[in-house]
């Protein structure tokens, strides 16, 4: 499986689309807006307001309304600082990045409806451009970005971890699609190694693109436990693996497809992220904290409704990569099974989700 081709959120604006089922990531983005606001203020304290334009990038933007929130927040803070500093009129250039499979049409349609693109106000003119490509490599010219933002994207891996088959070619993570309590230590080690390599590549590419003293605001799903197989980080993938296994038992999916599939994603701990940033040495950590949120952004006591809501949210960001492996024709059955597992086996009990937000500044010299 080529991750660059298979990884994207559900397209369009329909019932299963990411645009209609991203309330959780919207809440995460909303919770971290004060951090982004402070980052923009800090940029102005470093004399970046002397430039005619501020160049910002939102990496892994998908099609969520989050993008509008990010752009409007940066723009609003620029206007505020312009008034406070009595500086010249500024322009804001925002680059929206995701893999080529992303639904950029729906994204820009949404931005245009909110009068972001081409909207000229008194202090700040805003211009937006799409940049398809992998953020694990270079996307922009050297020293061209003042600010980088990424929300719930940097945990995706460039590929499934290597070394998950034995010398005889047998799958080492049989019956699972991610780290689980049953996974041998080599699986956990392979996932951490792949995340280390990919996040290091991410930092290295950004260190070349971000101007001296420029900054990044990164938000990642994470875990509090040192154990990567803890339920807080494995919940979604564990339930999907159970649902897929049930379809295997019914003869609807080939067992080999389950045994050879490993999700290209990793929920790191705060300590793991900190260690990688410090080892890389391109950025200093200005701010770093973890926080918890209810996975479902709704008050609902009915376990079946909770199951259906969670299944829709999960389907919105997992269906493309899952269907690439197992086929489009069984997707309805798979997510119906997922709903049933949440409602019946778990009685609608859904663990909270943990996130990390960090602000990094590029080291000079």
UniProtKB/Swiss-Prot annotation:
Residue numbers binding Mg(2+): 173, 259, 261-262
Presence of keyword Transferase: yes
GO molecular function list: metal ion binding; methyltransferase activity
Pathway linked to the protein: Alkaloid biosynthesis
InterPro entries, per the entry: MeTrfase_7, MeTrfase_capping, SAM-dependent_MTases_sf
Residue positions binding caffeine: 25, 152, 155-156, 317
Annotated site location: Involved in substrate discrimination: 149, 221, 265, 313, 328
Pfam families linked to this entry: Methyltransf_7 (PF03492)
Free-text cofactor note: Binds 1 Mg(2+) ion per subunit.
Cofactor requirement: Mg(2+)
Top-level lineage group: Eukaryota
Family: Belongs to the methyltransferase superfamily. Type-7 methyltransferase family.
Biological function: May be involved in the biosynthesis of caffeine.
Database matches in PANTHER family: S-ADENOSYL-L-METHIONINE:CARBOXYL METHYLTRANSFERASE FAMILY PROTEIN
Entry protein name: Probable caffeine synthase 4
Source organism: Camellia sinensis
Gene that this sequence comes from: TCS4
